[in-house]
């Protein structure tokens, strides 16, 4: 006669199930995660996962929630380690990279757009909001002190999009190594910092008048007949590593 599992055993099984789901997602996307496949890999009955999760979306949402909580905790700890706003921003940024490269499978799953809507899972929405607040809090302080110009919330998304794009390029193996990742990252941060310190430009119109759009289309059509040769960017020279001071 089968005995009832203890809560500790149940928690351990759920943790193993989530770990397998995270790995399978990283290897083959959502299609490679099914209740049957998970049960088969864990060596249990196909119905066992249903005792603890409604379906695979429920499992993936649980994995994402835990990942966002770990991500937020990592950023919070980094931000609390320094007091000066600019150094805090630097520390949070370094913690972001450290998490992404230490847990690439979790990072990909956190931001995969094919996952269930966060509002279907309150805990997932809470964890995601916690991470976003942590990324934007130091920018609000910097804006209040006049260190940067612009809406802190908008700027946080601009920075997030930039760092996320760079991280995903590296995880996908799209950065050749010359220039070095750190050279690209440093240059990106320099440009972002310079932009945030610059005075805000005049607001762009919400929508271009229809006549302007038509004129733009005509100009585009004329430009096609006389193609302009592309301007190739100058190669970035890799910085020499300085000896430790």
Predicted regions and their residues:
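Conserved hydrophobic residue
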Residues: 30, 148, 175-176
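Amphipathic alpha-helical linker/stalk segments
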Residues: 65-90, 120-135, 139-141
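Hydrophobic alpha-helical connector segments
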Residues: 62, 76-106, 155-159
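Helix-turn-helix
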Residues: 16, 20, 24-58, 62
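Generic hydrophobic, amphipathic alpha-helix propensity
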Residues: 13-22, 38, 63-71, 75, ...
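N-terminal intrinsically disordered/low-complexity leader segments
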Residues: 1-12, 23, 200-214, 218-245
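Amphipathic alpha-helical packing segments from all-alpha helical-bundle domains
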Residues: 119-145, 153-158, 182-194
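Amphipathic C-terminal alpha-helical segment
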Residues: 109, 141, 161-178, 192-202
């Amino acid at each position: 006669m089968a005995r009832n599992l203890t809560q500790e055993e149940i928690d351990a099984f759920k943790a193993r199930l989530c770990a397998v789901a995270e790995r399978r997602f990283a290897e083959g996307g959502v299609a490679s995660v099914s209740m049957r496949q998970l049960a088969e890999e864990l060596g249990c009955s196909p119905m066992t996962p249903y005792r603890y999760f409604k379906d695979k979306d429920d499992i993936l949402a649980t994995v994402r929630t835990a990942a966002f909580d770990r991500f937020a905790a990592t950023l919070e700890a980094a931000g609390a380690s320094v007091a000066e706003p600019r150094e805090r921003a630097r520390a949070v940024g370094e913690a972001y990279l450290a998490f992404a490269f230490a847990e690439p499978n979790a990072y990909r799953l956190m931001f995969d757009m094919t996952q269930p809507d966060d509002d279907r899972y309150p805990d997932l929405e809470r964890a995601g909001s916690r991470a976003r607040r942590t990324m934007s809090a130091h920018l609000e302080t910097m804006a209040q002190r006049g260190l940067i110009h612009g809406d802190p919330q908008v700027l946080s998304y601009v920075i997030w999009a930039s760092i996320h794009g760079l991280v995903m390029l590296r995880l996908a193996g799209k950065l050749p190594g010359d220039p070095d990742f750190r050279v690209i990252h440093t240059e990106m941060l320099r440009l972002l910092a310079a932009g945030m310190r610059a005075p805000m430009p005049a607001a762009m119109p919400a929508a271009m008048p229809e006549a302007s759009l038509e004129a733009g289309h005509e100009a585009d059509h004329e430009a096609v007949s006389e193609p302009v040769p592309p301007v190739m960017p100058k190669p970035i020279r890799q910085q020499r590593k300085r000896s430790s001071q």
